[in-house]
UniProtKB/Swiss-Prot annotation:
<feature type="compositionally biased region" description="Polar residues">
    <location>
        <begin position="430"/>
        <end position="441"/>
    </location>
</feature>
<dbReference type="GO" id="GO:0005634">
    <property type="term" value="C:nucleus"/>
</dbReference>
<feature type="compositionally biased region" description="Polar residues">
    <location>
        <begin position="1"/>
        <end position="10"/>
    </location>
</feature>
<comment type="subunit">
    <text>Component of the 1.8 MDa SAGA (Spt-Ada-Gcn5 acetyltransferase) complex, which is composed of 19 subunits tra1, spt7, taf5, ngg1/ada3, sgf73, spt20, spt8, taf12, taf6, hfi1/ada1, ubp8, gcn5, ada2, spt3, sgf29, taf10, taf9, sgf11 and sus1.</text>
</comment>
<dbReference type="GO" id="GO:0045815">
    <property type="term" value="P:transcription initiation-coupled chromatin remodeling"/>
</dbReference>
<dbReference type="GO" id="GO:0003677">
    <property type="term" value="F:DNA binding"/>
</dbReference>
<feature type="compositionally biased region" description="Low complexity">
    <location>
        <begin position="217"/>
        <end position="236"/>
    </location>
</feature>
<dbReference type="GO" id="GO:0017025">
    <property type="term" value="F:TBP-class protein binding"/>
</dbReference>
<feature type="domain" description="Histone-fold">
    <location>
        <begin position="338"/>
        <end position="413"/>
    </location>
</feature>
<comment type="function">
    <text>Functions as a component of both the DNA-binding general transcription initiation factor complex TFIID and the transcription coactivator SAGA complex. Binding of TFIID to a promoter (with or without TATA element) is the initial step in pre-initiation complex (PIC) formation.</text>
</comment>
<dbReference type="Pfam" id="PF03847">
    <property type="entry name" value="TFIID_20kDa"/>
</dbReference>
<dbReference type="GO" id="GO:0000124">
    <property type="term" value="C:SAGA complex"/>
</dbReference>
<dbReference type="GO" id="GO:0046982">
    <property type="term" value="F:protein heterodimerization activity"/>
</dbReference>
<feature type="compositionally biased region" description="Polar residues">
    <location>
        <begin position="19"/>
        <end position="29"/>
    </location>
</feature>
<keyword id="KW-0597">Phosphoprotein</keyword>
<keyword id="KW-0539">Nucleus</keyword>
<dbReference type="InterPro" id="IPR003228">
    <property type="entry name" value="TFIID_TAF12_dom"/>
</dbReference>
Amino acid sequence: MNGQHSSPGTPVQRPSAGPVNQAQFSQQRTNQLTSLLHTMTMYQQLAQNVGLNTPQGQVYLLQAQTIRRQLQGHAQSGQLPNQQLLQQLQSNGALQQGTPEPSNTRPRPQLNAQEQTMLLVRHRQLQTAQNYLTEMKEALGRIKNELSTNERLDTSAREALVKQESELTVKIAQFTAAISNGIRSIQQLQNRQASSANGNNTGTSTPVNASTDTRKSTASTPQLQQTQAQANAPQQRINPETSSVPETPVGVSAANVSNESTELATSATQQSGLANNVEKSQTPSYMSANHLPKVDSKSPIPFSVPPSRATLTGGYASGSIGLSTPGLSRAPHYELDNGNRLLSKRKLHDLLQQIDSEEKIEPEVEELLLEIADEFVESVTNFACRLAKHRKSDTLDVRDVQLHLERNWNIRLPGFASDDIVKSARKTGPTPSYQQKQNAIGTAKSLNKD
């Protein structure tokens, strides 16, 4: 363009950006290493504030040691870009840049990606457990203060507080034991790493042993992982960050510098996030999970329903018996409009239709008839029960109901007539002599008329 043409194969001169990019990567790496160094110093200060022998102080020291190992790897490789960083590492007890170690001193083992991930996960678990332990201790103190100072508590409220106090005491003991086991397992992991490093220097061990020790250390703290199962779930939803921080030595080329910068940025972000989450309070899961009602679900019990009518397929509609659905008998309609009455409104309307289909019944009369039916059945039942009790019987018989209906209401049950009523209603037939006399009287009357 602009009058300048380039033939095919002619090299085009472009400005070189190599030194500028190298300087930018170097500055970025310096900032990231400085951030890691400040994070390590902050963890050391926090450990001194809470106490080096306390469980929380041990957690802070372990986190500071993890960051220090990363910086030591860069110092031993001679890739620290700033002399000031080297002096700060030396003041914190780190190795000097480019200084060879004596042969009689034991080198500190370098952590691979798997071991570093494991340590970070353990640190998070210990930190979360320590936060929940602090919250539970505060809640226990409030409950004890309420029980000792508030004299207006009723019996149910006091029993509920005492129950919560006992539950918190048990959980505090469990969390304390889990934290102690977690710290002990991390220390054992570090000791095994040191011994495996010595074995590798003397040629008596292989990387397989290191991985075996890692698996053993992973299985040494099941109690801590079970205790923190509910604690890690909300933390992972709030802070979805990767726990794996691979350690890659700093190279000379621009690609290696870019990879190193990305990994250091991830590590610095993770360590800063852990430091910021130290004093954040979260709602413990035991405050809601343990008070939820337990639902016992029962498996359904299979049952067979006989077919409603005889069919050629044995109760199945059509087709194959194994592929079709059996015909089920329909349940009778359940009426809800009776209002706990013995006689339903539907039956009353049916009776009215049988007597006269054109007549209507008013709601007040309908309620009155339903009440009369209920009172009638109740009175008959009570009187029949008294008769059965008078007979010294525990079972109500038909004759008890029958006697009350016949004597008091003049109602005879069809098919259930008593013996005395049958005798009174029985008619005697005339004798032959009486029939002859009646015939003679009839004949005489007819003759007199003629």
